[in-house]
């Protein structure tokens, strides 16, 4: 489900990703199934990561190492030989001490930095991956079954049953009063389409399936686009290019880089294809909570936004319109958002972990 800034509802995207360990894009499009282009995790070497930090932020290696009463996030600093705050069991000096020193300096220089309560430790990351495995499995299952003649109500039941059978809970169900286990957004619906028996998928439709899972208190979130039967070349191109826009955002991820560079890369790619990007909704942190910091804008400027720090987890999920970027949120159900001009729209969502060398896909 997407996250909205300056709107009354939150939310997230939906679609399908197949991870490849090779270079480039893999996958085939099925006439009545999902569009599976796939992509690699873009990585940087530790040396490159260090260079990025030194060049952009000019870290001072001689900073005093005494503990501080309050650091960049208002919390105290552990002693160097104390157990690290992340739960790793390691001594602070062997774990997050250097990260905290960097973040403190960046904060002092005026950069927006993540607070420690959104950075995930090793045990947290493994728990989020377990949740994500269910979320990916749900969407893989939908890819096998979705076809013309299927109602979105049926899809909702599939997703509820699969999630419960695998020990999870659908995060959408009851969230802010949302009545279903998944968001199903067809053609001109940007986000938060509510499944119902009346919405029956037809040949030529494009639909976004946005699925989120809770397992042992940890959250995962991703979505996929599906082409139903034979679709027009215009719709197929919109779906394909929107996914490539997400890939452009992933390629812009650099540890100790800036979040605005990611959103700007997405926006630049989409505009170059003749499309517009929705302004009001974006990605979000996800892991400890369904929606947590940071907000991920896809109309951001390069060189702005939060510093990307290893341990951050968030979604990349632009909503790309074939027409104008304006939205219509007047639906009486209080949730469903459409394009204001009735044009088609597409969205893909992935959940990523920032690592020391690049990123890792968690859910797709």
Regions found by a protein language model. Give the residues of each.
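Acidic/negatively charged segments and metal-coordination signatures
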Residues: 2-12, 16-25, 29-118
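Active-site neighborhoods and metal-handling regions in enzymes and metal-associated proteins
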Residues: 3, 48, 79-80, 88-94, ...
């Amino acid at each position: 489900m997407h996250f909205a800034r300056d709107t009354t509802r939150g939310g997230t995207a939906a679609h399908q990703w197949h991870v490849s360990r090779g270079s480039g894009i893999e996958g085939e499009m099925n006439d009545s199934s999902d569009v599976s282009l796939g992509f690699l995790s873009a990585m940087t070497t530790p040396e490159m990561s260090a260079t990025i930090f030194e060049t952009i932020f000019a870290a001072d290696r001689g900073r005093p190492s005494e503990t501080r009463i309050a650091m960049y996030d208002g919390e105290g600093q552990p002693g160097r030989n104390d157990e690290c705050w992340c739960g790793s069991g390691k001594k602070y000096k062997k774990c997050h001490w250097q990260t905290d020193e960097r973040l403190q300096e960046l904060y002092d220089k005026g950069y927006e930095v993540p607070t420690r309560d959104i950075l995930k430790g090793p045990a947290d990351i493994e728990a989020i991956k377990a949740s994500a495995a269910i979320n990916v499995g749900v969407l893989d299952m939908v890819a096998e079954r979705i076809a013309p003649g299927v109602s979105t109500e049926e899809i909702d039941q599939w997703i509820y049953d699969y999630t419960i059978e695998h020990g999870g809970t659908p995060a959408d169900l009851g969230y802010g009063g949302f009545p279903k286990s998944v968001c199903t957004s067809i053609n001109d619906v940007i986000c938060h389409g509510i499944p119902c028996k009346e919405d029956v998928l037809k040949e030529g439709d494009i639909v976004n399936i946005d699925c989120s899972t809770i397992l042992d208190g940890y959250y995962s979130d991703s979505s996929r686009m599906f082409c139903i039967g034979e679709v027009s070349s215009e719709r197929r191109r919109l779906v394909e290019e929107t996914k490539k826009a997400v890939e452009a955002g992933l390629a812009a991820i650099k540890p100790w880089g800036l979040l605005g560079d990611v959103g700007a890369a997405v926006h630049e790619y989409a505009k170059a294809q003749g499309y517009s990007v929705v302004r009001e909704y974006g990605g979000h942190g996800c892991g400890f909570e369904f929606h947590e910091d940071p907000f991920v804008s896809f109309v951001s400027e390069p060189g702005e936004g939060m510093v990307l720090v290893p341990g951050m987890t968030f979604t990349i999920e632009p909503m790309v319109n074939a027409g104008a970027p304006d939205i219509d949120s007047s639906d009486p159900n209080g949730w469903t958002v459409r394009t204001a001009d009735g044009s088609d729209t597409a969205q893909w969502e992935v959940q990523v972990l920032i690592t020391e060398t690049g990123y890792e896909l968690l859910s797709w």
